[in-house]
Regions:
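Catalytic or ion-translocation cores adjacent to nucleophile or general acid/base/metal-coordination motifs
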Residues: 2, 10-94, 136-155
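Long, compositionally biased intrinsically disordered regions
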Residues: 77-225
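Hydrophobic transmembrane alpha-helical segments of multi-pass transport and channel proteins
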Residues: 5, 9, 50-70, 117, ...
Length: 225
């Protein structure tokens, strides 16, 4: 997950900057106005409620994983891979070999599709729903926040490097990523303990083992073995 987050950020930031520069050259104005850039920097600032929103977004990430698990279980329970593989209409349209490849592909990727689609809907719709009810609740996903930050910085150009607001927003990005992952993993961990009926004594042993691993090999939580 750490590698995935870093990979997303490393790709998103230069892509957004290049896209903004391309729009500036083609249309004569940046992708977002300076007023919008100023709002973006202040909304992402470490001095604001960004970390609270990041923790809330971690809950949404956990919810999307629940949707993914449900979708995969439903796919397997209904034997949809077999239906795709042997359905006469599908095999007639795609051919036997291609239908088999599609069935295999969907069996191994249905959870990813369900997770990404449900997360996209939640990230886009929940702030609108909460705003309708007067709740100023927003989302702070590390990849989206990094892209917004890059767009705001590109709007100002090189003078952005002298702006304190930019660096307060930059400082928030790693913490946003950490909260996204930690909150979602914590909720998943608690669910796993309940699902397996892990007793209090067993939980204490697990917590002790985690603490010992954290003290002895802290980087093993960040770098794949």
């Amino acid at each position: 997950q750490v590698a995935a987050v870093l990979g997303n950020v490393v790709v998103v930031v230069p892509t957004v900057v290049l896209l903004s520069l391309g729009i500036s050259l083609a249309l004569g104005h940046p992708m977002i106005s300076e007023k919008e850039a100023e709002y973006t920097l202040h909304s992402l600032s470490l001095l604001g409620p960004t970390l609270l929103f990041a923790a809330f977004t971690g809950c949404l990430l956990f919810a999307s994983s629940i949707v993914a698990g449900w979708a995969e279980n439903w796919f397997v329970l209904q034997r949809l891979d077999s239906a795709m593989r042997y359905n006469p209409r599908i095999t007639g349209l795609l051919g036997t070999a291609r239908a088999d490849r599609w069935a295999h592909f969907m069996r191994h990727n249905i959870s990813g599709f369900a997770s990404n689609i449900s997360l996209g809907f939640m990230l886009g719709l929940i702030p609108a729903f909460t705003a309708f009810f007067g709740l100023p609740l927003e989302v702070r996903h590390v990849t989206l926040s990094a892209g917004q930050l890059a767009a705001a910085a590109a709007s100002y150009g090189l003078p952005a490097l002298t702006m304190p607001a930019l660096w307060w927003a930059v400082a928030a990005i790693p913490l946003v990523g950490a909260l996204n992952l930690c909150v979602s993993f914590y909720l998943a961990y608690q669910l796993a303990l309940r699902a397996h009926n892990v007793s209090g004594v067993q939980r204490s042993h697990i917590h002790t083992a985690i603490r010992q691993r954290l003290l002895r090999k802290p980087f093993s939580f960040l770098i794949p073995g």
